[in-house]
Amino acid sequence: MRKNTIDIITLGCSKNLVDSEKLMKQLEANGYKVTHDSDHPQGEIAVINTCGFIGDAKEESINMILEFCQAKEEGRLKKLYVMGCLSERYLKDLQMEIPQVDKFYGKFNWNELLADLGKAYHSEFAIERHLTTPKHYAYLKISEGCDRKCSYCAIPIITGKH
């Protein structure tokens, strides 16, 4: 376990990846060493950016959370934070069922994590990211949410209107 190191695990869509990259830039600006989707996480803190849209993605997110809860119980991790769509949609259920998580953040309030770590949000880096994709491309988040109300879709419930 490395001091001042945070492991960021991103699950789900490319919009989640953009959110993780923005968070990574903010954490680096606050002096943290950040790893992303490492096969061997070594940080003292982990942040899991979850997906809550389709069944398989929800299951993957919950399994990842439980895996890191076990690492925390074994003393390989000090703090565990969860953000993203899963915690946006199922916050109360997750808080009751997985108390090992130090705090859950929704899709839009992940910057509160900085305050909880005793760090500042750097507005000068508001649009900057720590890119995790190969140098020849990067994802661009154009919008968030959806105005449609399709009976089969949870996106407007999770992310709100466009």
Enumerate the language-model features and the residues they cover.
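Proteins enriched for Cys/Gly/acidic motifs involved in redox and nucleic-acid/cofactor modification
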Residues: M1-H162
